[in-house]
Amino acid sequence: TTVFLADIKSNCPSRVSFQVAALPGARVEIEAIAIQGPI
């Protein structure tokens, strides 16, 4: 986050990370984004 804030002053990009070891036996990873209002 600190690195992003040094270069990007507004509209910071979203970031997602998963710890694979915390998903024992998982075969699928799902990420979703919800938007409310006009784009």
Curated annotation (Swiss-Prot):
Q: Give the CC-aspect GO terms.
A: cytoplasm
The protein depicted here goes by the name Ribonuclease UK114
What's an example Gene Ontology biological process for this entry? negative regulation of translation
Q: What keywords does the record list, in alphabetical order?
A: Cytoplasm, Endonuclease, Hydrolase, Nuclease
> Subcellular location, in the record's words?
Cytoplasm
Whether Hydrolase counts among this entry's keywords is: yes
Domain of life of the source: Eukaryota
- Provide the taxonomic classification: Eukaryota, Metazoa, Chordata, Craniata, Vertebrata
Q: How does it assemble?
A: Monomer.
Q: Which organism is it from?
A: Gallus gallus
